[in-house]
Each structure stands twice: as structure tokens, then as C-alpha cells.
Amino acid sequence: MLAAIDFVQPAIDIIDAGIVLGGRRVRPGDVDLPWVGAVLRRNGVVEETGLAAGVQGDPAIGVAWLARKLAPWGERLQAGEVVLAGSFTRPVPAQRGDAFEADYGPLGRFTFTFT
């Protein structure tokens, strides 16, 4: 399955609004995915931490599951599609003016603000 994935990249799901992609793109074989950690800060305060192993033991498992579920319907994941493997942190409430920093260690750090 990993051979079919060009890269992995951190993402934050803004519930019912979209996603924020950040950090750096990494080939799946170049990082031990279950051990990727995250620290999410809101206005400088740590709100959530997590480990990618919290997504079915390995985020790639969820992507493989999705590919298998689509196949009987004649559907498949297409090149260039963004696939979210699942969150390993809980949602954090946000309001206008809140500034977030997401630190994914070897996959990089990025910031975003609600306006």
C-alpha cells in the first residue's frame, strides 16, 4: 500500500469548513508513520497532543481500508487526491483571532489563524 502513496503531509481538519495542509511532504518509507507525533497549540498554550499510532495503529491502515471499500464499486483513489487518514488529536474549539501552531516533529510545523 505504501508504494502507491507519493507522500504524506500533516493536515488539520477544520470541521465542516475545510482542511489546512502544512509541514513538509515526506515519502511514506522515509518516516515511521505510527510514531509521528503532534503538538497543537492555541494562542501559545498546548491544547492537544497525539501519536499517529492512535489511528488504527498506523495511519496507512485507514487509507488501505478506504481503497478496499471503493474497489467493489469500481471506484479507486485517484492520483492527486487528498486523503485524510484520521485524526489522532481531539477537536479544539476556535474563535475569531485564535492563532494555532501544529508541530508534527519530523514532518514540520505550521501556523494558522482564524479570521
What residue ranges belong to the model's regions?
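Catalytic-core "active-site belt" of small-molecule-metabolizing enzymes
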Residues: 1-56, 99, 109-115
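Short, charged beta-turn/beta-strand-edge "cap" motif at the junction between a beta-strand
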Residues: 88-92, 106-109
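Short amphipathic alpha-helical surface micro-motifs
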Residues: 4, 20-22, 65-66, 83, ...
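Short glycine/threonine-rich loop-to-helix capping motif typified by GTGT followed
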Residues: 91-101
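A conserved acidic, glycine/proline-rich C-terminal tail/linker
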Residues: 59-91
